[in-house]
Every structure is written in structure tokens, then in C-alpha cells.
């Protein structure tokens, strides 16, 4: 009897176990591409991948999309005009259109006339619309990956906590576009943090300062009482000296010497205010007094130069508890600066903007912290949801960019050598907030303080970001975007800005989509195939912007490829010579450089070439493999002269179908 009872109990235990197992089975969602982080880079990656036909999950920890541009309120674009291309150009064009319809200028920041700024909520609205129109993109907010499954050296899936519930996301390719590089760390891929490499992380290493911006505006009809800072916030006196040395009531005008005036401060990060009918131009100082909306993001870097620490510890990235504490301290510093504005600077009718839509999710539980008394909550609740993070974990990729890759000629405004595998452009000068002494840089990469140029005089200049920095050295199924690409700390000082992160995000999205389309791992792709998609999206990849080859011309992509792979030379820095008529000697030399061919059909080398003659010549040249190239050859007809632009386009078409491409550096 006792044995029978045991068997019955065991049976019911098994039934309960099976039932419990199914009850706890995770919901699974399947996608082609999963983008972790909906910042500037993540949104661009999702848009590009969706436009290429992918199903995309865009997973974001906060309740905002747009990252540093919106959720961190760095909505004054740090561009130098030459990176206005691709999805970034689409985005700022929509920003201009939105404000133009409201008779409001966007060129009101950075003391310049050719600038772009917007309100964070407007930036988010535009990104959401771009994502909606891109294709199949599911935006999952307030969602955080907790674990990553890797089998056979490939990222397969990730468990994501969504509204307190764990959901399994499976994808063919994952992209880490988080603000901190958190997904890379979960994946097990090696990464750099400060000047050390995982898993041997030096806890004494440092990263750049963070900043907790705040959108503020002038309340001309009177400041709501709850938006007045009620007494000096904790730590105020610790920051007062720095505040006074940066901005003072009777400070200098721009350009000038520190400290600067409140008017100069407001013009630095000024953003549009459609309720203000004044005509404002960032390049005209006489209009700056009319600015009624700006962002606190100048004297409030955290930790700044205060205290004994030389910079922010890498624990900010590695330790959730330290991250939360540092974030709250950064909030306090910004609150202190707002108090300084309302008191010493005499800006008593200025405070946080109550119409940006902030106040939902926050990256830190500041409201439960004893250092934030109840009287500050009405103001802090209108702060952005998370800080501006300048330096994240950085993937160890197939290759790592160093300062040598971004040394630019001041006169030409670009690097002197081209990278054949370029997938994005950068332009910003090297800007490191904090210490850049050699002991804080990567010795294994040969980075030293002495090698860092002072490139602010030339306003930076163009450089290229190649395919290999997006792909892990070993792990498959994963790509990096945002500030997480494979670069040194010094290079991150130039690649962390919004225009660059949008362009590198677009590149990562193209790599991921092409990987799925071709059914190979990202590292197995031919960069030219990815470049072709980016050119289709009007994303410029070369160092040149020729006046005779605009991006809407038939020869533009061919000219881009010719400059990347070095098989043709331009007439000048500004003109390619698209309409120049080609001689056989020039055709021969181009094919030698582009395809490595040495033997050619006989022709009179000094004779001009017609398109039909070129077609016949190609049939003889590729006779042994004619099927491969026939489609390109059939598109060449007519007795018109073969132009340089037509030759460039034809060579690109041939390279696309060629069995392999030979890098010409």
C-alpha cells in the first residue's frame, strides 16, 4: 500500500513538473536583426536594416528613443557640415522642415550660422516617423537584456526583461547600440574599457566625464513656483568655483576669454523655441539675447576636475551600483548649476522646460535617494531620463582604429590616405573630456598623449571608419554600433558625436541586413556589397565631394568606388573630371589598378574610346568568363565617347560581379 501511494505521488509530481515547465517557458520572438539600444546609432541601424527588407527588433532600456540626441538632451548637432550624408542628412532635413513650417530657425547654436538644433521631443518624433516608414520595426521600450545565449561561437538569442517579464529574442544578427556597451559585455566578446581589455579590467582605469544635461527655458510670464530651486542643492559649494570660472554675470562675449556671460552660455547650446517669434541666428551675436530655450551642458561635466579622481572610473560601466551613484551625483551637479543661474547669474525666470515629455523612466532611482529632498522633485522630474555618456565599452574588432587613422591635413581638411573598406565618415576634432595622459591610454595600441594632434584649428576634417571595426575579432552573430565600435579612447573622442553615431549605426544596419540576405556571417561579407547598399542610400563613404559628381548623378557611386579603391585619380580636389573623354591608355591603366589585369586586347593607346568599342573590348577581355560579366557588357551601347564617369561606373559594376576584389591602398 505504501509503495502504491509513492507511485501515485510520483506520477502527480511529474505532471506538476511538466505543467510548471510549460508555465515558465519563455515567450520567444524571432527577428532577422535585433538592435539593442535605440539611441542615435540604434535607430539608424534599425532604419537601414528595415529598408533592406529585414524584420527588426529595436530594444531600448529607457522610454525614449534617440539616445544622446533626445533622451540625454544633446540636441545641438556636433557636425562640421561634411558628414551631412546618409540617414543623418535625412534626419536633419526633416528637422529643418519641421521648424521651417513654424517659422523657427534651427541654426541658433554653437555661435554659428551653419548649425542644427532641435527640441528633444521633436527629434524623437521624427525618428519614430522614420522608423515607422522604414519597414517592419518593432520598438520595445523599457526592456533590458539580462543574458545572452552563445552556441558554436555565435550569438543566438538574448533574454530580455520587458515590463518585468522575461522574453526570449532570437535573431540572425544582434547589434549592440547601447549607451554603455552592455550587450557586448553579456555576449562574452572581448571589449576595451578605459585603457584595459576584458576580462583583465584595470579598476584604476578611467573614461571620459559624463554630463547630465537639462533643457531650460525662459518663463517670460513668470516662473512657476515649483520650478524655482529651493535653496542650494547638496554639494553646491564644491562646484561653485568651477561655475564662476566658466560663466559669470558680467563675463566675456564670444569669442573671448573665460569666464563668459550668460548670453554666451545660452547661445552655445541654444535650441529652437516655436513660441518665440524673434529672428535668431547663431552666427549673429546681436540676436543671442532673444534666445529663450537652451540646454545646460557646459560647466557641469561629472566629475570634472573636482576632487582627487583624475576622471570617471571604469566602474561607471562595469558596476550598476557605481553607475547609479555617479548618475545621481551628475544630476545634483546640474541642479546646482541651475541654482547658480537663478541666483548669481540673475536668470530668475529660467528653469527646466516642462514641455519636453520627460518624467517617466529614469536610469537611476534618484527619487528614493536621501540627498534629493522633496522640494527638488518638481525640477528633477523634468530632467532627461539618462545622462550623456561619452565613452562606453568598445568592442575588440577585427581591427581597431587608432589616432594614426584620423590624423588630418589641416589644409585639405581630411586624412591623406583612403580606406577601401570605408562604411562611414567622421569629421569632429579629437575631444576628450578629462585626462588624456599616456598612462590613461592604450599602450598596446601605441597610443600616447604626444601623438594626439591639436586639430581644433582646422576644425577636425574628414576621416573614414572601415568595415572591420564593426565586427568582433572572433564572435559571430554580433556587431557594434554607437560608441561601441572598435576604436581607441582617442579615436572615440571623434567618433562619439551624433552625426558619426548615426552614420556608423546605418553602416551596422547594412552589414546586418546583407549578412542575412547572403546567409553568411558578417565577417564573411565583401565590404563592397555593403558599400553598394550604403551608396543606394546616398551615404557618402569617400573623402571627396566632387562638384561634377553629385550624389544624384549616374556616376556618383562609381566615382565613390574609384576613390575608395584607388583605381582612378581625380582632376583636382574639387573635380573628378566626370565628362573627360577616355583614351585606351587610360582605360588600360584603370583595369590594371582595379582588377589586377596585365594582358589586354591590342588597341591604339592614344586613341579615344567610344562606348561601343569599349563594349567589344570587354567581350574579348573577359572571353573566358563571359557569362559572369555579360550583363554589364550588354548595358554598354552607342557611339558616344566613353567618359571618365562612365568608365568609373562600369568598373564598379564589374567589381560587383567579380569573384573577389583586390584592395588597392
Predicted regions and their residues:
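Short, solvent-exposed alpha-helical surface patches in non-cytosolic proteins
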Residues: 60, 553-565, 572-623, 632-658
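Conserved N-terminal/central alpha/beta ligand/cofactor-binding core
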Residues: 48, 54-55, 60-147, 151, ...
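Beta1/beta-strand and adjacent pyrophosphate-binding region of the FAD-binding site
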Residues: 28-39
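Boundary at the C-terminal end of the N-terminal hydrophobic targeting segment
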Residues: 21-25
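Flavin (FAD/FMN)-binding glycine-rich loop and adjacent Rossmann-like elements that form
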Residues: 162, 166-173, 177-535
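N-terminal Rossmann-fold NAD(P) dinucleotide-binding loop
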Residues: 42
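Bacterial N-terminal signal peptides
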Residues: 9-18
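Conserved beta-strand-loop-beta-strand element in the redox core of flavoprotein oxidoreductases
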Residues: 149-168
Amino acid at each position: 500500500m505504501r509503495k502504491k501511494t509513492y507511485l501515485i505521488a510520483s506520477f502527480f509530481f511529474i505532471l506538476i513538473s511538466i505543467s510548471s515547465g510549460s508555465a515558465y517557458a519563455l515567450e520567444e520572438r524571432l527577428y532577422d536583426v535585433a538592435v539593442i539600444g535605440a539611441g542615435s546609432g540604434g535607430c539608424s541601424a534599425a532604419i537601414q536594416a528595415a529598408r533592406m527588407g529585414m524584420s527588426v527588433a529595436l530594444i531600448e532600456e529607457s522610454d525614449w528613443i534617440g539616445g544622446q540626441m533626445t533622451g540625454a538632451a544633446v540636441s545641438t548637432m556636433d557636425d562640421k557640415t561634411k558628414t551631412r550624408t546618409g540617414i543623418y542628412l535625412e534626419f536633419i532635413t526633416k528637422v529643418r522642415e519641421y521648424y521651417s513650417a513654424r517659422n523657427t530657425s534651427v541654426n541658433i547654436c554653437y555661435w554659428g550660422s551653419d548649425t542644427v538644433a532641435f527640441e528633444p521631443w521633436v527629434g524623437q518624433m521624427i525618428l519614430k516617423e522614420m522608423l515607422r516608414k522604414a519597414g517592419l520595426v518593432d520598438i520595445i521600450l523599457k526592456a533590458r537584456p539580462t543574458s545572452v545565449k552563445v552556441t558554436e561561437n555565435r550569438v543566438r538569442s538574448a533574454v530580455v526583461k520587458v515590463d518585468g517579464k522575461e522574453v526570449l529574442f532570437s535573431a540572425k544578427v544582434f547589434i549592440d547600440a547601447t549607451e554603455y556597451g552592455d550587450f557586448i559585455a553579456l555576449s562574452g566578446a572581448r571589449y576595451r574599457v578605459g585603457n584595459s581589455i576584458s576580462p583583465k579590467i584595470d579598476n584604476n582605469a578611467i573614461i571620459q566625464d559624463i554630463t547630465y544635461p537639462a533643457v531650460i527655458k525662459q518663463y517670460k510670464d513668470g516662473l512657476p513656483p515649483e520650478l524655482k530651486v529651493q535653496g542650494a542643492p547638496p554639494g553646491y559649494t564644491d562646484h561653485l568655483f568651477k561655475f564662476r570660472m566658466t560663466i559669470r554675470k558680467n563675463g566675456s562675449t564670444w569669442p573671448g576669454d573665460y569666464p563668459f556671460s550668460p548670453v554666451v552660455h545660452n547661445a552655445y547650446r541654444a535650441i529652437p523655441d516655436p513660441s518665440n517669434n524673434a529672428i535668431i541666428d547663431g552666427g549673429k551675436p546681436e540676436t543671442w539675447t532673444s534666445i529663450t530655450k537652451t540646454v545646460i551642458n557646459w560647466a557641469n561635466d561629472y566629475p570634472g576636475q573636482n576632487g582627487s579622481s583624475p576622471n570617471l572610473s571604469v566602474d561607471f560601466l562595469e558596476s550598476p551600483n557605481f553607475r547609479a551613484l555617479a548618475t545621481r551625483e551628475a544630476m545634483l551637479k546640474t541642479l546646482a548649476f541651475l541654482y547658480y543661474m537663478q541666483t548669481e547669474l540673475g536668470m530668475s525666470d529660467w528653469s527646466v522646460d516642462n514641455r519636453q515629455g520627460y518624467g517617466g523612466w529614469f536610469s537611476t532611482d534618484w527619487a528614493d535617494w536621501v540627498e534629493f529632498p522633496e522640494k527638488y522633485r518638481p525640477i528633477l522630474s523634468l530632467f532627461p531620463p539618462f545622462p550623456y555618456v561619452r565613452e562606453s565599452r568598445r568592442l575588440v574588432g577585427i581591427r581597431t582604429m587608432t589616432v594614426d587613422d584620423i590624423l588630418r591635413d589641416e589644409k585639405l581638411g581630411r586624412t591623406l590616405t583612403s580606406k577601401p573598406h570605408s562604411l562611414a565618415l567622421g569629421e569632429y576634432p579629437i575631444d576628450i573630456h578629462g585626462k588624456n595622459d599616456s598612462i590613461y591610454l592604450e599602450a598596446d595600441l601605441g597610443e600616447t598623449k604626444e601623438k594626439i594632434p591639436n586639430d581644433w584649428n582646422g576644425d577636425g576634417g574628414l576621416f573614414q571608419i572601415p568595415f572591420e571595426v564593426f565586427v568582433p575579432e572572433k564572435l559571430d552573430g554580433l556587431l557594434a554600433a554607437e560608441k561601441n565600435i572598435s576604436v581607441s579612447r582617442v579615436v572615440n573622442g571623434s567618433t562619439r558625436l551624433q552625426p558619426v553615431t548615426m552614420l556608423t549605426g546605418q553602416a551596422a544596419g547594412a552589414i546586418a541586413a546583407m549578412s542575412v540576405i547572403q546567409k553568411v556571417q558578417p565577417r564573411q561579407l565583401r565590404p563592397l556589397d555593403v558599400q553598394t547598399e550604403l551608396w543606394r542610400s546616398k551615404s557618402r563613404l569617400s573623402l571627396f565631394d566632387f562638384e561634377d559628381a553629385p550624389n544624384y548623378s549616374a556616376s556618383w557611386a562609381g566615382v565613390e568606388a574609384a576613390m575608395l579603391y584607388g583605381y582612378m585619380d581625380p582632376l583636382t580636389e574639387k573635380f573628378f573630371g566626370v565628362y573627360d573623354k577616355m583614351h585606351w591608355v587610360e582605360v588600360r591603366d584603370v583595369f590594371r589598378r582595379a582588377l589586377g589585369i596585365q594582358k589586354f586586347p591590342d588597341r591604339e593607346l592614344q586613341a579615344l574610346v567610344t562606348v561601343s568599342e569599349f563594349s567589344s573590348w570587354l567581350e574579348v577581355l573577359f572571353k573566358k568568363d563571359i557569362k559572369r560579366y555579360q550583363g554589364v557588357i550588354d548595358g554598354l551601347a552607342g557611339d558616344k565617347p566613353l567618359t571618365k564617369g562612365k568608365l568609373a561606373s562600369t568598373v564598379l559594376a564589374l567589381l560587383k560581379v567579380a569573384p573577389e576584389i583586390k584592395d588597392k591602398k
